[in-house]
């Protein structure tokens, strides 16, 4: 058993020696190819360097951490809180709520349930057949969002938007 292990190790060591020498030769060939041994225009250390090419020192000097792709991607990411805020959000939400509430709906009184007072015409807006409950839920959601954005001034905004629809 020990003899077999010893032979296997010996075979592995000879393979490793061959592969390292082969890798050394491949690296040498690669550096010759990249340096452009046959073409002085591609050889950076050549005295026949064309005028439009810059020496390698200048290229390395300008290669700073800020110019890497990863740093650029990190800087270009928006903060987590980015998005429409303030008046823009209020106007978007109110416009969508105005579209979802049918112009013929009566003004919502405090005693009237929300689902009975506002029924959305989703078929007209999106061209899809949606049941009454889904339309009412959608309308309810947008009215609640509008209430959360506008707060106390909702009734004034309600008459401003929905008064024009009639």
From Swiss-Prot:
Q: Where is this region: Disordered?
A: 1-22
Q: What is this protein called?
A: Orofacial cleft 1 candidate gene 1 protein homolog
Read off the InterPro entries from this record. Answer: OFCC1
The source's superkingdom equals: Eukaryota
Q: Which species?
A: Mus musculus (Mouse)
One Gene Ontology cellular component annotation?
microtubule cytoskeleton
